[in-house]
């Protein structure tokens, strides 16, 4: 990725960037992507890793058979468990965990959101 960043492209396409990365590598990748985004560059990322997608993406498109079957802000797309499962994907881990609690008005989809919600629930 570093050799591409040096070329300063307006658009960067990453295909399954978390493939074969350990958790530390994923964290490093998130830092690199944050660096790229801070420079107002466009990123197109193809991934099956919904936890990764939840942490870094603003807008999500769900593709199945080359067709867009879902799109929108990542919060609405990644918490639509039926849509994702219907197309062979899993919701982010925190969304699946908190969905089991039931009775929540809004499911978290990012780890930070889950931590904030957990703190709020504990305080009540």
Predicted segments — roles?
Residues 53-55:
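A short, surface-exposed alpha-helical micro-motif characterized by mixed small hydrophobic
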Residues 23-25:
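Helix N-cap at the start of a conserved alpha-helix in ABC-type nucleotide-binding domains
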Residues 71-72:
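ABC ATPase "signature
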Residues 47-48:
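H-loop/switch region of ABC-family ATPase nucleotide-binding domains
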Residues 84-124:
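ABC ATPase nucleotide-binding domains
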Residues 12-15:
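Catalytic Walker B motif of ABC-type/P-loop ATPase nucleotide-binding domains
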Residues 65-66:
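Conserved ABC ATPase "signature" C-loop
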